[in-house]
């Protein structure tokens, strides 16, 4: 069932059935109840998480304000990519916004798989780059809007 779902996810859409099976073999399906902290801000976990069902809230703790939601992710979205690729601490928390299920893919496992399967690696990394480019574009638009608002004050 999750393999059919992954075929609809942009990150995995170009992978063939055998490649998807290989990804699923290194991944772990996890269920998270509403409010569960999947990734705590400032921790390192080295896993990429793909949302299968439910929603995940990405947030930061803002001094004097508390938790500030940055975005809410839905099925097909992924998170944890910063620490997954560069090993740095998480820049934000990921919290189950409602009951959800994720596919968690450990960095070491996918790295080994990509080394062994260059075609899978190329497809995966190209899809990943397209997704990140879209996120960067969205962030630039938000920053432009915030700068325009700040200049009004």
Model-found features: residue ranges?
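Cytosolic regulatory regions built on CNB/CRP/Popeye-like sensor folds
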Residues: 1-153
């Amino acid at each position: 069932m999750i393999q059919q779902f992954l075929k609809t996810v942009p990150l995995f859409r170009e992978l063939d059935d055998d490649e998807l099976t290989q990804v699923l073999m290194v991944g772990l399906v996890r269920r998270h109840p509403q409010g569960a902290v999947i990734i705590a801000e400032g921790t390192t976990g080295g896993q990429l998480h793909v949302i299968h069902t439910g929603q995940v809230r990405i947030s930061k703790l803002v001094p004097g304000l508390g938790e500030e939601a940055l975005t809410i992710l839905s099925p097909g979205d992924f998170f944890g990519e910063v620490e997954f690729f560069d090993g740095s601490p998480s820049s934000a928390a990921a919290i189950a916004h409602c009951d959800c299920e994720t596919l968690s893919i450990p960095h070491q496992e996918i790295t080994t798989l990509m080394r062994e399967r260059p075609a899978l690696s190329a497809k995966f990394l190209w899809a990943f780059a397209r997704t990140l480019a879209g996120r960067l574009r969205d962030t630039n638009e938000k920053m432009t809007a915030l700068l325009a608002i700040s200049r009004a004050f």
